[in-house]
Swiss-Prot record:
(6S)-5,6,7,8-tetrahydrofolate binds at L112, G116, H117, L118, E247. Pathway: One-carbon metabolism; tetrahydrofolate interconversion; Amino-acid biosynthesis; glycine biosynthesis; glycine from L-serine: step 1/1. InterPro entries: PyrdxlP-dep_Trfase (IPR015424), PyrdxlP-dep_Trfase_major (IPR015421), PyrdxlP-dep_Trfase_small (IPR015422), Ser_HO-MeTrfase (IPR001085), Ser_HO-MeTrfase-like (IPR049943), Ser_HO-MeTrfase_PLP_BS (IPR019798), SHMT-like_dom (IPR039429). Its main location: cytoplasm. The lineage of its organism: Bacteria, Pseudomonadati, Spirochaetota, Spirochaetia, Spirochaetales. Homodimer. It comes from Borreliella afzelii (strain PKo) (Borrelia afzelii). The keyword Ligase does not apply. Its cofactor is pyridoxal 5'-phosphate. It holds the Pfam family SHMT. This is Serine hydroxymethyltransferase.
Amino acid sequence: MRDDQIFNLIEKEKLREKEHIELIASENFTSLEIRQAVGSVLTNKYAEGYPLNRYYGGCSFIDEIETLAILRAKELFGAKYANVQPHSGSQANMAAIMALINPGDRILGMQLSHGGHLTHGSRVNFSGIFFNTYFYGVSRDSELIDYDEVLKIARDCRPNLIIAGASSYSREIDFKKFREIADDVSAYLLCDIAHIAGLIVAGFHNSSIDVAHLTTSTTHKTLRGPRGGIILSGKDFNKLVTFNGKEKTLSNAVNSTVFPGTQGGPLVHVIAGKAIAFREALQENFKEYISKVIKNTKVMAEYFKSEGFRIVSGGTDNHLFLVDLSSLDLTGADAEKLLERVNITLNKNAIPFDKKSPALASGIRIGGAAITSRGLNESDSLNVAKFIVRALKTRSDIELKQIKKEVVRFIRDFDMP
């Protein structure tokens, strides 16, 4: 019997996505092929272990699928090693951290309120519960990462692991400088490229693969794949590490921390979706897509500046930027709810040195990846920014209703992938 309750809600979500302007920087739209793979019979199969070494029978086709995903990931990122099994970016980070250091060791990561991520040492996350954590941030003046300050902090706290990467930092990250700092204090370097993976494989951001000991990423966001995680390594993939009191290559240690260390059976249907996403990202038109993402994002940021808004760090080099709403006496939480009323979806976000709590926040985060997937160009993105500014400045019910009508009429012209 059909579950009408669930399928009616799915249809409502489908309509919401079609009639809303999606600006959440961590979201994107997958291709139909990816959705078909993720919704396929592969969801039925249990496959603990790795290709040719499973704990269950009947995995011959599963082995081929996972092997394809691994080969495509290695080709796409220029990596020597890839593990495509992590269920999420957070689980990829957990497995990577466990392969490199032991509970109680020291981690130096980016301050969450300055653009970092929960898994980079936050006290409420496994990374801050099981490890001793220290933090670097951005300069108060420039709102850019101060690498000299990172080195100073690293020399003071002597971390076993440094994590480079961010969830709301709009500038290019110099991974080579982070490796120099890590080498200076004899630490491992883990680079989390979840947000910028698409930019890296398209050649619009420097790569961490041969710089970091390990690189982690999600497979959605700018990669446009299904929700999931991946762990990669370049020239250090065969480096010997001490794991559970024994010497192992780094790649073997990661395989152990993914399964059986943090997961059981992999999500084979999602791995198939990842394989398709990697193939899509290997096509020439993916570079064109990422180029448009960056242009669209810059256009929006510049319009906000022209309207008197302060953009954190003064601009953007990637797919996102933060808008400081302090001049409007409006919290990020208020703005998020206000814009939802006009069918524009984004998220509240703390800004560096924010005096408001994370639940309120002083800023909003805006991303250009999803709208670009729907075919919006620079002129269209400018219109999106204008809708937002109008809504934030007016706040009157009558005007908000009018903006919503205009938004729906505008965005309906752009097909969903």
